[in-house]
């Protein structure tokens, strides 16, 4: 049989795909979080304008959101507590969609947040895959459980 039709082990292929999606999602959150951390007054001003929130509170909230975006991006990138980090990212992305709406007349950029929500949902359902710290931890716990049974 030709190598063209030979299928590699699907577990490794799936984990490689999950890793690629984790990297993309993580860098999206690094980009967004670093912007908020480096200039919290900028995002805070937008929050103030859109919600009427106190300017100081809006700036502080922008900083907190930015730090958590950086942390969740780091966790998703290394595959540690991937599911909770992805759930947090879904909440942030839904918040962004609720603030800015879905104006499909603005071109293909509007699909970014729904696409990222899809990636985050996939991570919630599948975890980090074989190429994440979660996998190594679960493998270690499974070995401990098996040794306790014996």
What are these regions (language model features)?
Residues 44-57:
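Perimembrane loop-to-helix junctions flanking transmembrane segments
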């Amino acid at each position: 049989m030709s190598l063209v039709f030979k299928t590699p082990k699907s577990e490794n292929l799936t984990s490689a795909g999950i890793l690629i999606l984790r990297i993309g999602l993580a860098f999206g959150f690094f980009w967004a979080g670093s912007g908020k951390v480096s200039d919290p007054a900028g995002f805070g001003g937008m929050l103030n304008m859109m919600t009427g929130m106190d300017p100081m509170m809006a700036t502080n909230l922008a900083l907190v959101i930015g730090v958590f975006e950086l942390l969740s991006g780091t966790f998703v990138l290394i595959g540690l507590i991937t599911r909770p980090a992805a759930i947090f990212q879904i909440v942030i992305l839904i918040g962004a969609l609720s603030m800015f709406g879905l104006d499909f007349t603005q071109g293909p950029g509007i699909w970014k947040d729904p696409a990222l929500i899809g990636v985050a949902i996939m991570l919630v359902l599948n975890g980090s895959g074989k190429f994440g710290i979660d996998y190594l931890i679960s493998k270690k716990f499974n070995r401990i459980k098996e040794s306790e049974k014996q």
